[in-house]
């Protein structure tokens, strides 16, 4: 699996303990944490450290999304489900929302998945709360469509990416 990748404005790499404090700073805000089930009740430093530490023991992987000036803008996540599907997720700090970073990161992430021999060709899914309009718009722009099934977590809409052969990698 890939460790890092870059876009025009972003540097994305596997999350480490060195990211925990900054991750808490951008995530432990109600307007961000309300959309993430694992951040229920907030996202203090202990939760950030536990999430980062667990990624080697679970089928979950997290990536730090940094601007070229090295500021942490957000995070990407991947869950390798037993049914062979890959679930992606993302969140960005308030100061970095609405600037196109989310789409840029997700699009490049999907391109990395499509070219990784261990991941390519597998179904890619995502989910969002019905009232998370920004996330739903981002997923649609990235090529996802709502499915008739709910997400893996309660009260979520399930989304699926168009089949691989209909998604052409493109530069961001």
PLM feature segments, named:
Residues 31-52:
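Conserved GNAT-fold acetyl-CoA-binding loop/helix
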Residues 52-64:
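A short helix-loop-beta-strand connector motif used in the catalytic cores of GNAT acetyltransferases and
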Residues 1-34, 62-172:
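Acyl-donor (CoA/ACP) binding surface of acyl/acetyltransferases
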